[in-house]
Structures are given as C-alpha cells and as structure tokens.
Amino acid sequence: MKDNHCWGCGADNPDGLHLKSRWEGDETVARWTGEPRFAAGPRHFLNGGIIAVVLDCHGVCTAISDAYRREGREVGEDPEIWHATTAMNVHYLRPVPIDAEVILHGTVTEADVSGTTVECILEAGGKERARATVRSVRVPDSWRHAVVR
C-alpha cells in the first residue's frame, strides 16, 4: 500500500522490517528472517518485542487484505482500507533463533462492523514459537493524516 511508513510492514520505511503477508488458500503467510540487531539478551534469540511487532503487523495486514477481499477489490485500490490494532494477546511458547526463517500464519476468525480478529502463529525451525490474537478496527483515511496532541 502506498505511503505506508509502518516500521514492521511499511514499504516506505527505509529502516523497517518490510514484512510482506500474502494469501495462501484461506490463510495468510509471511516469511522473514531476523538480524543480529534484533537480538534478545542472548544474541542467538530474537527479542520478544520484535516477535510482537511481526505478529501485530501480520495480523493487521491480514485484516486489511480480508476487508479488500470481502469488497471484491485488490489491495491498495482507492479508496484505501486501513486498520489499526485495538488489542493483541501474545503467547511466547519457545525462543526464536535469531538466524532462523520466521514463518507467520494468519487466519481470520471474526470480521464484522466492530472489527476483525486474526489468529497468528509464528513458526521457526519447524516449531511453533509464538502465537497471538490480533484485534483491529477499520479506520478512516483521515487517521493517516491526523495530528495527535
């Protein structure tokens, strides 16, 4: 989507993670590999905050893409659809090796006028490492340009 500066999924953020979520059947999938700068205390594990970021972004991108699908439109078509996270519950199950490819899976479990809920799973090394329930709401275009005081 144009003009997306999100640190996790924004293509327009030169310092971001550039996470890209795509549909594979009835779920979304994203693949990403960490770098040493994203380490936890031990340098061989991914930081928990980074894990939360990729789960959050994958969940919200899934919700946005699902909204476009429900309207029969391509992602990014005007008028653009944007969502913002309202709640997220993360369960850290196992450490994530810093050099392992992370595979994210997203499944929409609820979508209505009050928002969208996505269940996300983070796998690495063939094992489930974390999971999250991400709730987001559709926001007006003015949300992207608002000044918060």
Could you tell me what each predicted segment is?
Residues 11, 20-22, 45, 80-82, ...:
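Generic marker of residues within folded, mature protein domains
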Residues 29-66:
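A conserved, well-ordered hydrophobic junction motif at loop->secondary-structure transitions
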